[in-house]
């Protein structure tokens, strides 16, 4: 999924802003208090509409990103000598390019199609008037997933990751080798749009991967894909090892100035 453009109205410090996004990469630059974080939070809330439509996901803060009381624009009131929220509700409108895909289990081939969809959020509940195209897109993914065994195909789910600077210090030391009781979809999207990082869940998954694979509960190669994604995102990493004894990832890193890692 690629967001083509986003319109933000009456949200935090923005009364009206329009952003057209590059399909490959976007860098947000600006002085403090100019709205860099506001734009990122608006994208989180926009994508929260997708998570809300996923019936496979449980409820709770880890699986949602909705408007908060602090998101409303406030103006100074001379009569009350303080800031009060304006009457207009926040509104976030999105145009996105979505890839609908299915994996054919008999041929091991992936077939995809691309279409543009539109939706907007004005409250913490989706409606057909505001998000019908998104609701149909998610319903198609879920139906294909639900009928995977019968039809011999499976769905491709979009990847979401919201990563802010404060997330680096959240939950890092919380890794425990505990038994996972969440569904595959729940583990995939947990904390995707949250301020916290589900480090424990990721570590538990990689720690138990071989055992789960042997029991038929995992797909072959997903552990390598996970580690390759980390190395692709951080080019300095040359090698990753899983230290299950000490509950740690260990990595071999080569800095630009060094000849060897």
Describe each model-derived feature in a short phrase.
Residues 244-248:
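Short Gly/Ser/Thr- and Asp/Glu-enriched loop/turn motifs at secondary-structure junctions
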Residues 222-226, 250-261:
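Accessory N-terminal region flanking or inserted into the helicase ATPase core
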Residues 1-201, 215-243:
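P-loop NTPase switch/coupling surface
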